[in-house]
Amino acid sequence: MCSSDLRESGKARYIGVSNFSPEQIDEAAKYCPIVSVQPPYSLLKREIEKDVLPYCIEHDMGVLSYGSIGAGALTGKFKERPTFEDGDKRGEFYEFFNEQNWPKTKAMIDTLEEIASSHGKPTVHAAINWVLKQKGITVALVGARTPEQVIMNAQAAEWELTDEENAKIEAAYAKIFA
């Protein structure tokens, strides 16, 4: 059963795609309306700003970004480059954890930590709020390993970054990743 059949039979109301390029979205849209896209997006992974995000804005599609806290890197948990347990592939899969990129990652974390702490909030809130402040983003999907992390992540919705704070993050990003 294909996605359009699921929609027509009432088993699915809407169809979204994950990790699609604009060209792939166009191809999928030939078969059924696509209402949302789920790409990776965070301060450490911004590739969608070049094509996917503008496409979604132009076509009025929802964007449910995943990886919004950079596989945990942007939580503020890691004060130095982490070493992961056997079976945890973050160190291999995410380039921002590697030895060469860690100093840049840490500098970005420090910027988020400074802003979040000025509100008396955890660093992860600034990372989530930055994603939510970006034009075209509908939802910032975040992972959690404990019930406490779920609550902490949800509490990010209790405040927002100011335009000045967002500009400070963007300036830091431009300097760090230039």
Question: Each predicted region: which residue ranges?
Answer:
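Beta/alpha (TIM)-barrel catalytic core signal, keyed to glycine-rich beta->alpha loops juxtaposed to Asp/Glu
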Residues: 4-177
